[in-house]
Regions:
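Active-site-proximal loop/helix segments of hydrolase catalytic cores
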Residues: 40, 53-90
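Flexible loop residues that form catalytic
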Residues: 82, 115, 144
Length: 157
């Protein structure tokens, strides 16, 4: 059974770190605003390990220059593509946004999450889309169980 009082008690013990930059162990981070509903306090993060490994994670967001500048300086970016092209919304990426970004940062891998697409070649029935956008080679559609490994120079999926 869900115990709301217990969760509220736990929530009060959390120390929120809201600095825009910092270091934790061997990881440095940058925190920056992204383009999404302001009520959820949307931020992206760029992480850099002392080994040279680095990545960006955006969470829910639509196109925004601050995110794209962080991606430009990174080996891989985990970005969402939450809506198909025909949806009129500003706070999520569409296929055309991803295509444009992939051309802008050809040396950065873009790992798509939170997509409206069913996984291509899935063993399950396709429910949401049978039409898959064609992207440049630096775009990867993430899937459950995907594993990213740093090989000392780049990320391998």
């Amino acid at each position: 059974m869900f115990d709301l009082d217990r969760w509220q008690e736990i929530f009060q013990t959390i120390s929120w770190i809201e600095e825009t930059t910092g270091t934790v162990n061997e990881w440095s981070f940058e925190r920056f605003k992204v383009n999404h509903d302001i009520s959820v306090d949307p931020h992206g993060y760029r992480l850099q390990h002392s080994s040279g490994a680095n990545l960006v994670h955006s969470g829910d967001t639509g196109p925004c220059e601050e995110l794209y500048q962080a991606i430009k300086r990174s080996n891989i970016a985990i970005v969402e593509m939450g809506v198909p092209e025909w949806v009129e919304i500003d706070g999520h990426h569409k296929p055309s946004h991803i295509e444009s970004l992939s051309q802008r940062v050809p040396d950065t891998k873009l790992l798509l999450t939170h997509t409206y697409l069913d996984m291509k070649d899935s063993e399950f029935e396709v429910l949401t889309s049978k039409d898959y956008p064609v992207f440049n080679d630096n775009v990867i559609h993430a899937y459950d169980g995907i594993c990213l490994k740093w090989n000392g120079q780049n990320w391998k999926a």
